[in-house]
Amino acid sequence: MDNQWFQLGYLISAGLFIFGLKMLGHPRTAPRGNQLGAMGMLMAVLTVLLETDLVTRPVLIIAGIALGAAIGSLLAIRVEMTGMPELVALFNGFGGAASALVALAEIYSAIESDTIPKGLELHVAWTAIGLSALVGWMTLTGSLVAFAKLKGGFMILGKWRRTPTWGPSWLNGVKGLIMLSSIVVIYLSVTTPDDFQMVWVLILLACLLGVVLVLPIGGADMPVVVSLLNSLSGIAAAFTGFIISNPCLLYTSPSPRD
């Protein structure tokens, strides 16, 4: 199939996303906006499947779609309207994790197949992968903490535990140190691109950063935090779109979605 048709598919999906987001701004048009967003996602998925020739593996594709649809439907049906902020926090985390997993798969594939790029391409690709991993895993753990705070607590060994709000002044220094360490690890991964251990170190730092960023914030401010995490999830997806050369992710990911 001609590449022009794939670009047209991405353009149509991006248009549906944009119009859907605009309609989400008013309660009367929000249901229609949600439908347009779903149609845009369907168009994007179909375009990717056709462009990458993944339709030759129908069992894997159908299984993934069925599993994702089942989990999403179950969560959306069971959660009351008052629990929507918690659900949005979870979806933000899942979106960030998806972007981070794609980055992880890309770097693993390049190392295993010995197709690591050279020169400027290496610096650009590995930096984008590192930033996608950093923002994605940070969004996941931060969203999980936000979910626990909105819910008020969680069950541990059959006992209800309240989510703590803990943030001494010295924790700000720890946040800065973790962020600086993450940047150093990304730099080291560029200088030693075949060292997969750097990836695990970056994942650990990013997960820890997400926790310490959200932990000091009280439950009353969680909607603001969820909105910020939503934006970070979009940024992680944009980095991923750059990594895999997917224009649809670049068009729509940075857009605010709530």
Regions found by a protein language model. Name each.
Residues 31-39, 84-95, 168-174, 224-229:
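Cytoplasmic-side transmembrane-helix entry/capping segments in multi-pass membrane proteins
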Residues 2-14, 55-68, 129-137, 195-204:
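Structural signature of hydrophobic alpha-helical transmembrane segments
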Residues 1-58:
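N-terminal transmembrane signal-anchor/hairpin module of polytopic inner-membrane proteins
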Residues 251-258:
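Conserved small/polar residues in nucleotide/adenosyl-binding loops
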Residues 107-116, 233-250:
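Transmembrane helix-loop junctions at the membrane interface of multipass transporters and ion channels
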